[in-house]
Amino acid sequence: FEAVAREPRFRSVATIHPGLPGWEDDLTTAVGAGAVAVRADPGYLGLSPAGPEMLALVQAAGGAGIPLLAAVRLEDGRGRHPLDVAPELAPWAVRQWIRASATVRLVITHADRGFIEEVHHGSTPAEAGRIWWDISWVWGPPDDHLALLLATMGAARFLFGSGQPLRLAETPGARLDLLSLPAADRAAITHDNAAQLAGRRSP
């Protein structure tokens, strides 16, 4: 929060560990401090994604009107250190979260096309409308995974994400450049969707 106070372009995302005592107070503090989302990566926190701790956080975030952010992975498995054994987030976990609360909004990062399609098409339209995806792990040309997702799901479901510092920020920008998107769709992905998501406290 101190860094955000010094830099007007920054927005805070508070990490919450729902397995620790007093996490509810941390959530209240984050909301009061103007955080745009709270984050919990169950694999790295040593928690089951479907366990009571994560489901309690999902419900609490929904009740507080603040989005919950989680990453499918943080880096390519081929480059991970042997001691980095945290499991990747699975599509079924995201579907369980979105069904655990009628008000929670989810931001899922580092998901590939298959993961996104499995969750999106396995959810009801109302559920899918409360999930946003960053594009950091979605292939662009020549495979055109991003183009296909935008054609089938619409630009409103996507956010610009780079995966920094473990991935290059230029890559997702190049993917958008190669697509020659309408100006409105590009603006939605690069900033409008995020601004709308951060600026409202309830669905």
Regions of interest found by a model, annotated:
Residues F1-D76:
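Active-site gating/metal-coordination segments in enzymes
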Residues V4, S123, S180:
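Conserved hydrophobic residues forming the short capping helix/wall of the S-adenosyl-L-methionine
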Residues A5, G32, R99, A151-T152, ...:
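Solvent-exposed polar/charged
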Residues P21, I116-E117, A169-E170:
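Short N-terminal helix/helix-N-cap motif within the alpha/beta-hydrolase-1
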Residues G22, P49, P141-P142, L168:
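Secondary-structure boundary/capping motif
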Residues T28-T29, M153-L159, R167-P203:
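Mid-to-C-terminal alpha-helical segments outside catalytic/metal-binding sites
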Residues V36-A37, A50-L159:
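Catalytic pocket-lining loop regions of alpha/beta-barrel enzymes
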Residues G163:
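Active-site glycine-centered loops adjacent to acidic/histidine catalytic or metal-binding residues
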